[in-house]
């Protein structure tokens, strides 16, 4: 299940069966669906693992994005999943954007890159978050 036009297309091109593309208004900047139709569809779902990208993440604000419509969808995705995996490279740490869509307490795993400083890695682990350096 995805709201990303690019991910859905990539999986379909590889012959992956059963890809479910969420409807809604397509936001050209991110090639994702947003809006009430997207959020309503997500709210009817229950998934084992949710993957969500973040424009910024910090101990103070959690996960954030500059766009309110993206934040609404991302918030619904976080609440639909049993295990929540946030994806954000280390340059996004301590960057806070206009709209918070999840507190760090709602995140189980953060996948980031190896340039995350050790002290920041430790601070996230101290919050009970598994940090995967990829």
Give the label of every model feature segment.
Residues 3:
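Active-site catalytic microenvironments in core metabolic enzymes, especially phosphate/sugar-handling
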Residues 6-134:
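Conserved phosphate- and dinucleotide-binding cores of soluble alpha/beta proteins
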């Amino acid at each position: 299940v995805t709201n990303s036009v690019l991910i859905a297309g990539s999986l379909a091109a590889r012959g992956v069966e059963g890809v479910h593309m969420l409807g809604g208004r397509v936001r050209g900047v991110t090639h994702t669906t947003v809006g009430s139709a997207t959020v309503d569809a997500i709210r009817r779902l229950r998934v084992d693992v949710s993957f969500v990208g973040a424009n910024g993440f910090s101990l103070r604000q959690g996960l954030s994005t500059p766009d309110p419509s993206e934040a609404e969808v991302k918030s619904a995705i976080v609440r639909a999943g049993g295990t929540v995996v946030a994806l954000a490279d280390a340059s996004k740490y301590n960057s806070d954007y206009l709209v918070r869509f999840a507190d760090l307490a709602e995140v189980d795993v953060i996948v980031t890159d190896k340039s995350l400083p050790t002290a920041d890695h430790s601070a996230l682990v101290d919050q009970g978050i598994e940090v995967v350096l990829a």
